[in-house]
Amino acid sequence: LQTILDCFFEVIGKEGTLIMPTFTYSFCKNEVYDKINSKTKMGALNEYFRKQTGVKRTNDPIFSFAIKGAKEELFLKDTTSCFGENCVYEVLTKENGKYMTFGGQGHTLTHYAEEQFNVFYRYHKIFSGILIDENNISYNKTISYYVRKLDISSEPNLINIINIVNNTKNFKKNNFAGDHINIYNAKEYIEILWKKLDINQTILIENYDTIY
């Protein structure tokens, strides 16, 4: 795991910032979000990274991130919505950052595009709970999560999403350990989704209607 981290930092250099998702979904499960002790659901590498010296974690009790690098403070701002103003996705897009996936098909960056576009098949749901910060201080926190409407078929259409974003200009794909590493320019990723949503607001969900 350390070898992988060393490779990342070698590539991004002193001016780069490494960000990894450390999602816990704590408030969705009525659990306390402890920034130091709440384990991530995102795999061994992400859990290993968040425990490294100098790594900081965001305050989001649902979709947190572990961050280290030259511009880390830009990504550590508090936010009232998981995919809203000042969230990691917004800063990554504005900073023209890169978005990389190791295998898997789900892309949470898509939800940022959906919230900013205000898609009809999601709505803001408020979650509240206890957050314990890095100084072991507890306080109440409330955050909005732009969740799916369950009365319609709003499951993500992964085939459509992947086909769309894999057509961005700077998309790169490499085989690795029996799966794929995909790299996107975050701004291009968001803009192509907005372009498609302008044409058809159902294009990113299973309830896909070609004549919507």
Report each predicted region and the residues it spans.
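N-terminal and secondary-structure boundary signal
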Residues: 1-212
